Amino acid sequence: MVDTCFVEELASAAPAPGGGGASAYVGALAAALASMVGNLTVGKKAYTEVEGEVMHHLAELKGLRSRLIELVDADARAFEPLAAAYRMPKGTPEELSAKQEAIQRALVGATEVPLDIMRTVARVVDHADYLAHHGSRMARSDAGVSAAFARAAVDGASLNVYINAASMDDADRARRVREEASAIASTTRERCDELFDFVVKEVS
């Protein structure tokens, strides 16, 4: 049932997929677990009053899950021009200049994709939070795992933002992406921890 191809590729010596793609994949799992809670709620008499709202969250999560799967590959694609730029020759001043320009261009994409991962996972948490509080109590532990995975996904993606921003010559752009990543990470971390603690109390 489990497709091990991605895991095996991740374990290989290939530079991509790496931490960014893995973070997107973990984010997709967070969305899937939140969806599981919703799907186990729909159709149950005890949750008739919230069924319409649950269906809304399920529809949103489906889109977010698909987007995160797309971002797994997008992260690998964003790394390719950066890796190619680092391999460019630098034997002459002209070659060195061309190499540096190529690196700087590639760094933009290499930071934007993990930022997109972070933004998307933060939205997953919105829906997971609702479903943890209003969805099936039988699946509440799965909502907690969703929160834990979402936290890991955001933290992982943030590292890719920071490491690439550190190499940017454009100090203003670097500052902006670092600040956005830091803000998303801080807020999402806090929300995920609160949600996880709520689930622990509910299931203990």
Model region roles, listed by residue range:
Residues 120, 124-127, 131, 139-199:
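Preference for long, well-ordered alpha-helical segments
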Residues 75, 79-148, 152, 164:
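Amphipathic alpha-helical interface segments
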Residues 12-33, 139-157:
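Conserved phosphate/anionic-ligand binding catalytic regions in large, soluble enzymes, centered on
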